[in-house]
């Protein structure tokens, strides 16, 4: 296995022991991108000159034994809706093509302070709206396990780049499953932290009450290491939580004997494919063999998650995206002859089909006469979904189930069928609506396409999720999976 598939933990050890220089790691990563990414299409922009310069500076610090930082010399890829100072940030949209920010997002400041090295920006569904990365204005990313399949979305580039060995970790954002679903489709580990665990300052907003940044990696411990680096309260984000405990690695390796695991009957019901059910049931038996107590429970309002989510998320999107007006920044129509035309034409030409669909839906749901029937009712359903989880967590430590109801579908198969596309979020949207942490880990394959297992935890209890996910991972040989790639 080449260094491109080394874990974050192993790379840190190799660098600390001076067996490899940060500049050698960065060179190997760019060589891998040059070789593989013309096919995978995961990157939208590379920051090669600055990355090489930063790596050379880290080489000098390494020589002086001044290797400060939790991620010293580790390459990273960042979803293109996370602001990067001086590097184009487009949200994969024509609307923001050529937009170069003049400030840094909080997560990027933290990662730079930990001496990670930015490799480039990763493809995504436009403004994070989609489940296949096919709504990107620039390119369609493919699944590294099967190039005929989608990588999932909206963080498809983030998942594909990690799976293909193009970066050891990436950041994505998760509004209704946009980290966990592509992680499942691409056979990697994806964590959606508790709402408020990670600062959203510098994340281009889609749905502000749902969005959360999180890491994608090739194993569980790496994921915990990265989340430690990016977590914490932020004065620039009033929704970030003042929670001091950001230690996620100390319980990794501890057994799960006696851990109470809830398996909702709704998560293996109608709409979930047989191959996914079988993989999850096998995973449940593995958890039992490790000493966990697994019992069936009910989350009765699960079926209302998708309609509730799409009304709330689209409503918030219609408000958040109103700032893209063709005047202050972003795409500016050259054909307009009046201010009203400028607004209309810039937005009509700058936004893609899916983004416009959701703006229309959200504007309708918030309009006079329909607000109570749609938006207000959806918020009430959101409370019911949260109450379901609260009740289960009175007696259980974690919830387990599939991440997605199927494996990755083919490119072009669902892009013109929004309802079918939205149905893929059946098992992920309730977690966002309740503000809970959720992690997806690989649990098998069907016809060469990965299957994801989702663990859902109590608020700010990511530590327990990592503990149980790590123990499960020890029974699933990821080395062989990536060696085949």
Curated annotation (Swiss-Prot):
<keyword id="KW-0436">Ligase</keyword>
<keyword id="KW-0648">Protein biosynthesis</keyword>
<dbReference type="InterPro" id="IPR020556">
    <property type="entry name" value="Amidase_CS"/>
</dbReference>
<comment type="subunit">
    <text>Heterotrimer of A, B and C subunits.</text>
</comment>
<comment type="function">
    <text>Allows the formation of correctly charged Gln-tRNA(Gln) through the transamidation of misacylated Glu-tRNA(Gln) in organisms which lack glutaminyl-tRNA synthetase. The reaction takes place in the presence of glutamine and ATP through an activated gamma-phospho-Glu-tRNA(Gln).</text>
</comment>
<dbReference type="GO" id="GO:0005524">
    <property type="term" value="F:ATP binding"/>
</dbReference>
<keyword id="KW-0547">Nucleotide-binding</keyword>
<dbReference type="InterPro" id="IPR023631">
    <property type="entry name" value="Amidase_dom"/>
</dbReference>
<feature type="active site" description="Charge relay system">
    <location>
        <position position="154"/>
    </location>
</feature>
<dbReference type="InterPro" id="IPR000120">
    <property type="entry name" value="Amidase"/>
</dbReference>
<dbReference type="Pfam" id="PF01425">
    <property type="entry name" value="Amidase"/>
</dbReference>
<comment type="similarity">
    <text>Belongs to the amidase family. GatA subfamily.</text>
</comment>
<dbReference type="GO" id="GO:0006412">
    <property type="term" value="P:translation"/>
</dbReference>
<dbReference type="GO" id="GO:0030956">
    <property type="term" value="C:glutamyl-tRNA(Gln) amidotransferase complex"/>
</dbReference>
<dbReference type="InterPro" id="IPR036928">
    <property type="entry name" value="AS_sf"/>
</dbReference>
<dbReference type="GO" id="GO:0050567">
    <property type="term" value="F:glutaminyl-tRNA synthase (glutamine-hydrolyzing) activity"/>
</dbReference>
<feature type="active site" description="Charge relay system">
    <location>
        <position position="79"/>
    </location>
</feature>
<dbReference type="InterPro" id="IPR004412">
    <property type="entry name" value="GatA"/>
</dbReference>
<protein>
    <recommendedName>
        <fullName>Glutamyl-tRNA(Gln) amidotransferase subunit A</fullName>
        <ecNumber>6.3.5.7</ecNumber>
    </recommendedName>
</protein>
<keyword id="KW-0067">ATP-binding</keyword>
<feature type="active site" description="Acyl-ester intermediate">
    <location>
        <position position="178"/>
    </location>
</feature>
């Amino acid at each position: 296995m080449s260094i491109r598939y080394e874990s974050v933990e192993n790379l840190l050890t190799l660098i600390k022991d001076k067996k490899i220089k940060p500049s050698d790691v960065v060179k190997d990563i760019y060589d891998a991108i040059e070789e593989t990414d013309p096919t995978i299409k995961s990157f939208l922009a590379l920051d090669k000159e600055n990355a090489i310069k930063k790596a050379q500076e880290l080489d000098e610090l390494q020589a002086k034994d001044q290797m400060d930082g939790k991620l010293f010399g580790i390459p990273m890829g960042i979803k293109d809706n996370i602001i990067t100072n001086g590097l184009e940030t487009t949200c994969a949209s024509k609307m923001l093509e050529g937009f170069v920010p003049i400030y840094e997002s909080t997560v990027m400041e933290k990662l730079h302070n930990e001496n990670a090295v930015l490799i480039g920006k990763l493809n995504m569904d436009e403004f994070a709206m989609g489940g296949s990365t096919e709504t990107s204005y620039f390119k369609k990313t493919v699944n590294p396990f099967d190039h005929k399949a989608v990588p999932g979305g909206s963080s498809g580039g983030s998942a594909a780049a990690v799976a293909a060995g193009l970066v050891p970790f990436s950041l994505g954002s998760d509004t209704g499953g946009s980290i966990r679903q592509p992680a499942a489709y691409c056979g990697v580990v994806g964590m959606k932290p508790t709402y408020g665990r990670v600062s959203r300052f510098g994340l281009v907003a889609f749905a502000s009450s749902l969005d959360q940044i999180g890491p994608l990696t090739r194993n569980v411990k790496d994921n915990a290491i990265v989340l430690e680096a990016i977590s914490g309260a932020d004065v620039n984000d009033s929704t970030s939580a003042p929670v001091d405990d950001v230690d996620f690695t100390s319980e990794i390796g501890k057994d799960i004997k006696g851990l109470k695991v809830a398996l909702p009957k709704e998560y293996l019901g109608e709409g979930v494919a047989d191959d996914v059910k079988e993989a999850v049931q096998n995973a449940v038996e593995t958890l039992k063999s490790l000493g966990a107590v697994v019992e069936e429970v009910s989350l009765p309002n699960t079926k209302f998650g998708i309609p509730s989510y799409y009304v709330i998320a689209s409503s918030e999107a219609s408000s958040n995206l109103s700032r893209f007006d063709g005047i202050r920044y972003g795409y500016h129509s050259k054909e307009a002859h009046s201010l009203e035309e400028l607004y209309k034409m810039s937005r009509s030409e700058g936004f893609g089909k899916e983004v416009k669909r959701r703006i229309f839906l959200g504007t309708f749901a918030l309009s006079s006469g329909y607000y109570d029937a749609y938006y207000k009712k959806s918020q009430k359903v959101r409370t019911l979904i949260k109450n379901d989880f609260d009740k289960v967590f009175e007696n259980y430590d974690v919830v387990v189930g599939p991440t997605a109801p199927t494996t990755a579908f083919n490119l072009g198969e669902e892009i013109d069928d929004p309802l079918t596309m939205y149905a893929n979020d059946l098992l992920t949207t309730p977690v966002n609506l309740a503000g809970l942490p959720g992690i997806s880990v690989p649990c098998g394959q069907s016809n060469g396409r990965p299957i994801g297992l989702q663990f859902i935890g109590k608020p700010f209890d990511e530590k327990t999720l990592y503990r149980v996910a790590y123990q499960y991972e020890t029974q699933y040989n990821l080395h062989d999976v990536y060696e085949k790639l």
